[in-house]
Amino acid sequence: MTGREASKSTKSREFDIGSFPIVISGNLLRIAQIKDEPWLTDSVTDPSNIISKLKEMRPAPDIFIFSQRLPDMKPHFNFYSEYDNLAAIPISTYDHWWRNQLKPATRNMVRKAEKAGITTRVIQFDDTLVNGISAIYNETPVRQGRKFWHYQKDIPTVRRENATYLDRAAFIGAFLNDELVGFLKMIYVGQHAKVMQILSFVRHRDKAVTNALLAKAVEVCSSKKLTYLVYANFSYGNKGEDSLSGFKRRNAFIRVDIPKYVVPLTMKGSAALALRLHRSPTDLLPRWLIVPLLATRRRWLSLFASHREAA
């Protein structure tokens, strides 16, 4: 093993404890978490077993972080906890969502998509879909003011990265004539579904493709008697709400707070927890600093994209 490989191995280590895949990351502060926790069907009901196994390790990780899941919104365990937030649509019937939860302006956006010729349907994961996703990925190097990390990925990579959890996945395609112009992938997790990815061509943004995809997702969830459709977080750290939060609100997503537990396993972990060093920069930096920094990044990346298109 080279020195560089050894350094990488200390930054991330994966193994199983019982039925849960655990990943440990970090060098100065080693944090253990359940890998892909939001997408797993099982939730932690006996954290003491995982904690004792982690403490037996040499060296032991400094902190263990795990979360509860919908619909369990009240803390169950006697550990230090914070609240993470989700963007979720409570679902009863499609008609109830359409008439009572959705704002009139957003209903008009779904109608606008229909008038523009956009149709939506559940589709299979196959080579045709992979090629369509690749075309959407490669349209632009910048999305929502940040560098788009899927840009210029090759077909095998696109196929591999979108083939996760296929036994519990549903793909919805948005079509203009016969062309795929947008897609949504959601994963069924217990009694709710979680949006893993939703994306459409920027050149068709005047056709409300994303609104149409979400409407179809609600319809599918309602037909399966699911209780929630979850779309990532409602807000992120001290950045607060942004344009994406507003989009989610207009589509009837609400903020739901879920307990997240932060368990120190070492003296270093206890000190780090006291100093809140387990948090991300957007949780630590004040909003008055985060917002202008993000705005500067958006302007720079937009300028970069403009120069790239002109070249």
Describe each model-derived feature in a short phrase.
Residues 1-30, 77-96, 227-311:
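Active-site/acyl-donor-binding loops of N-acyltransferases
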Residues 61-63, 192, 228:
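Residues at the N-termini of beta-strands
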Residues 25-45:
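STAS-typified acidic loop motif
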